[in-house]
Amino acid sequence: LRQLEYINMLPLPLRIERPSFLNALCAPNGNRPHVIAEFKRASPSRGDILMDFPPEEAAKQYAEAGASCLSVLTEETYFKGTLGYLKRMSAPGLPLLRKDFIFDRLQVAATAATPASALLLIVRLTPDAALLRSLREQAEAHGIDAVVEIFDEADLALARDSGARIIQVNARDLDTLQVD
Protein backbone atom coordinates (compact mmCIF):
# COMPACT_ATOMS: atom_id res chain seq x y z
CA LEU A 1 0.00 0.00 0.00
CA ARG A 2 2.87 2.37 0.72
CA GLN A 3 4.24 1.81 -2.79
CA LEU A 4 0.82 2.55 -4.27
CA GLU A 5 0.60 5.69 -2.16
CA TYR A 6 4.08 6.73 -3.29
CA ILE A 7 3.12 6.53 -6.96
CA ASN A 8 -0.31 8.05 -6.25
CA MET A 9 -2.14 4.87 -7.25
CA LEU A 10 -4.16 4.00 -4.13
CA PRO A 11 -7.61 2.70 -5.06
CA LEU A 12 -10.29 5.38 -4.90
CA PRO A 13 -13.04 5.10 -2.30
CA LEU A 14 -16.24 3.58 -3.62
CA ARG A 15 -18.97 6.17 -3.93
CA ILE A 16 -21.79 3.93 -2.77
CA GLU A 17 -24.49 3.99 -0.13
CA ARG A 18 -23.18 1.46 2.38
CA PRO A 19 -25.75 -0.30 4.56
CA SER A 20 -25.06 0.69 8.17
CA PHE A 21 -23.54 -2.07 10.28
CA LEU A 22 -24.58 -0.31 13.49
CA ASN A 23 -28.15 0.31 12.31
CA ALA A 24 -28.51 -3.33 11.23
CA LEU A 25 -27.60 -4.46 14.74
CA CYS A 26 -29.95 -1.94 16.38
CA ALA A 27 -32.94 -2.43 14.08
CA PRO A 28 -36.04 -4.13 15.50
CA ASN A 29 -35.82 -7.86 14.83
CA GLY A 30 -38.88 -9.25 16.60
CA ASN A 31 -37.77 -11.58 19.35
CA ARG A 32 -34.86 -12.91 17.32
CA PRO A 33 -31.27 -12.02 18.13
CA HIS A 34 -29.19 -10.24 15.52
CA VAL A 35 -26.64 -12.63 14.02
CA ILE A 36 -23.30 -11.62 12.53
CA ALA A 37 -22.40 -14.60 10.34
CA GLU A 38 -18.68 -15.08 9.69
CA PHE A 39 -16.86 -16.29 6.58
CA LYS A 40 -13.26 -17.42 6.90
CA ARG A 41 -11.14 -19.81 4.90
CA ALA A 42 -8.76 -20.78 7.70
CA SER A 43 -7.71 -20.01 11.25
CA PRO A 44 -4.45 -20.47 13.14
CA SER A 45 -6.15 -22.85 15.59
CA ARG A 46 -8.21 -24.93 13.12
CA GLY A 47 -6.28 -24.79 9.86
CA ASP A 48 -8.16 -24.82 6.55
CA ILE A 49 -11.97 -24.47 6.64
CA LEU A 50 -14.14 -25.17 3.57
CA MET A 51 -11.51 -23.90 1.15
CA ASP A 52 -13.64 -24.66 -1.92
CA PHE A 53 -16.94 -23.16 -0.72
CA PRO A 54 -17.81 -20.10 -2.85
CA PRO A 55 -18.08 -16.84 -0.85
CA GLU A 56 -21.13 -15.85 -2.92
CA GLU A 57 -22.93 -19.03 -1.85
CA ALA A 58 -22.00 -18.47 1.80
CA ALA A 59 -23.41 -14.93 1.66
CA LYS A 60 -26.61 -16.17 0.03
CA GLN A 61 -27.11 -18.92 2.60
CA TYR A 62 -26.36 -16.63 5.55
CA ALA A 63 -28.84 -14.04 4.24
CA GLU A 64 -31.53 -16.69 3.70
CA ALA A 65 -30.96 -17.93 7.27
CA GLY A 66 -31.64 -14.43 8.62
CA ALA A 67 -28.18 -13.01 9.34
CA SER A 68 -28.20 -9.28 10.06
CA CYS A 69 -24.58 -8.72 8.97
CA LEU A 70 -21.68 -10.64 7.48
CA SER A 71 -18.18 -10.77 8.93
CA VAL A 72 -15.55 -11.44 6.26
CA LEU A 73 -11.97 -12.39 7.08
CA THR A 74 -9.70 -10.63 4.58
CA GLU A 75 -6.33 -11.29 6.27
CA GLU A 76 -4.24 -13.37 3.85
CA THR A 77 -1.51 -15.10 5.89
CA TYR A 78 -3.34 -16.68 8.83
CA PHE A 79 -6.93 -16.69 7.61
CA LYS A 80 -6.39 -17.08 3.83
CA GLY A 81 -8.72 -14.21 3.06
CA THR A 82 -8.66 -11.49 0.44
CA LEU A 83 -10.23 -8.06 0.01
CA GLY A 84 -11.99 -9.47 -3.05
CA TYR A 85 -14.26 -11.55 -0.81
CA LEU A 86 -16.03 -8.34 0.24
CA LYS A 87 -17.23 -7.65 -3.30
CA ARG A 88 -18.04 -11.30 -3.89
CA MET A 89 -20.22 -11.40 -0.76
CA SER A 90 -22.04 -8.09 -1.30
CA ALA A 91 -24.95 -9.32 -3.47
CA PRO A 92 -27.42 -9.98 -0.62
CA GLY A 93 -27.04 -6.35 0.48
CA LEU A 94 -26.18 -7.13 4.10
CA PRO A 95 -23.65 -4.92 5.90
CA LEU A 96 -20.15 -6.37 5.59
CA LEU A 97 -17.51 -6.23 8.34
CA ARG A 98 -13.92 -6.37 7.11
CA LYS A 99 -11.99 -8.44 9.67
CA ASP A 100 -8.25 -8.00 9.34
CA PHE A 101 -5.29 -6.71 11.31
CA ILE A 102 -5.89 -3.01 10.60
CA PHE A 103 -3.50 -0.56 12.22
CA ASP A 104 -2.67 1.98 9.51
CA ARG A 105 -4.55 4.74 7.65
CA LEU A 106 -3.69 3.13 4.29
CA GLN A 107 -5.56 -0.01 5.33
CA VAL A 108 -8.58 2.13 6.11
CA ALA A 109 -8.23 3.76 2.68
CA ALA A 110 -8.07 0.30 1.07
CA THR A 111 -11.24 -0.68 2.94
CA ALA A 112 -13.02 2.41 1.60
CA ALA A 113 -12.40 1.06 -1.92
CA THR A 114 -14.51 -2.03 -1.08
CA PRO A 115 -18.22 -2.43 -0.31
CA ALA A 116 -17.45 -2.96 3.42
CA SER A 117 -19.84 -1.25 5.83
CA ALA A 118 -17.54 -1.74 8.83
CA LEU A 119 -13.96 -2.59 9.69
CA LEU A 120 -12.35 -4.16 12.72
CA LEU A 121 -9.93 -2.19 14.89
CA ILE A 122 -8.19 -4.32 17.53
CA VAL A 123 -7.08 -2.33 20.57
CA ARG A 124 -4.07 -4.63 21.07
CA LEU A 125 -2.80 -3.61 17.61
CA THR A 126 -3.49 0.10 18.14
CA PRO A 127 -2.86 0.66 21.87
CA ASP A 128 -2.74 4.44 21.44
CA ALA A 129 -6.17 6.04 21.92
CA ALA A 130 -5.29 8.92 19.57
CA LEU A 131 -4.37 6.52 16.74
CA LEU A 132 -7.45 4.42 17.41
CA ARG A 133 -9.60 7.57 17.29
CA SER A 134 -7.90 8.72 14.07
CA LEU A 135 -8.50 5.39 12.31
CA ARG A 136 -12.12 5.30 13.52
CA GLU A 137 -12.75 8.86 12.34
CA GLN A 138 -11.14 8.14 8.96
CA ALA A 139 -13.39 5.10 8.52
CA GLU A 140 -16.49 7.02 9.56
CA ALA A 141 -15.64 9.80 7.09
CA HIS A 142 -16.13 7.14 4.37
CA GLY A 143 -19.41 5.92 5.88
CA ILE A 144 -17.72 2.88 7.41
CA ASP A 145 -18.49 1.89 11.00
CA ALA A 146 -15.56 0.91 13.23
CA VAL A 147 -15.95 -2.21 15.36
CA VAL A 148 -13.40 -1.91 18.17
CA GLU A 149 -12.25 -5.21 19.64
CA ILE A 150 -11.20 -5.51 23.26
CA PHE A 151 -10.00 -8.29 25.55
CA ASP A 152 -9.87 -6.75 29.01
CA GLU A 153 -10.79 -3.67 31.04
CA ALA A 154 -7.65 -1.77 29.98
CA ASP A 155 -8.65 -2.31 26.33
CA LEU A 156 -12.18 -1.14 27.17
CA ALA A 157 -10.83 2.10 28.62
CA LEU A 158 -8.85 2.76 25.42
CA ALA A 159 -11.86 1.91 23.26
CA ARG A 160 -14.01 4.36 25.22
CA ASP A 161 -11.30 7.05 25.05
CA SER A 162 -11.24 6.63 21.28
CA GLY A 163 -14.97 7.33 21.02
CA ALA A 164 -15.84 3.82 19.87
CA ARG A 165 -19.57 3.29 19.26
CA ILE A 166 -19.37 -0.46 18.57
CA ILE A 167 -17.26 -2.61 20.91
CA GLN A 168 -16.82 -6.36 20.64
CA VAL A 169 -15.15 -8.62 23.18
CA ASN A 170 -12.70 -11.30 22.07
CA ALA A 171 -12.30 -14.10 24.62
CA ARG A 172 -8.92 -15.01 23.09
CA ASP A 173 -5.97 -13.11 24.57
CA LEU A 174 -3.96 -12.06 21.52
CA ASP A 175 -0.78 -11.92 23.62
CA THR A 176 -0.99 -15.59 24.66
CA LEU A 177 -3.66 -16.94 22.25
CA GLN A 178 -5.37 -18.51 25.28
CA VAL A 179 -9.16 -18.35 25.60
CA ASP A 180 -10.42 -16.86 28.84
Named regions from a protein language model:
Residues 1, 137-147, 151-154:
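Alpha/beta catalytic cores of nucleotide-metabolism and tRNA/nucleoside-modifying enzymes
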Residues 1-50:
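An N-cap/entry alpha-helix motif that binds or orients negatively charged groups
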Residues 26-29, 60-64, 87-91, 110-113, ...:
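Acidic (Asp/Glu)-rich catalytic clusters
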Residues 36-38, 122, 168-170:
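Non-cysteine beta-strand/loop elements that form the S-adenosyl-L-methionine
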Residues 36-56, 94-103, 145-150:
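Active-site mouth loops of central-metabolism enzymes
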Residues 44-52, 58-78, 159-180:
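Glycine/Thr-rich beta-alpha phosphate-binding loop at enzyme active sites
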Residues 66-69, 91-95, 113-119, 140-144, ...:
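Glycine-enriched alpha-helix->loop->beta-strand junction motifs that scaffold or abut catalytic
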Residues 74-94, 101-109, 123-138, 153-158, ...:
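Active-site-adjacent beta->alpha loops and helix N-cap segments on the catalytic face
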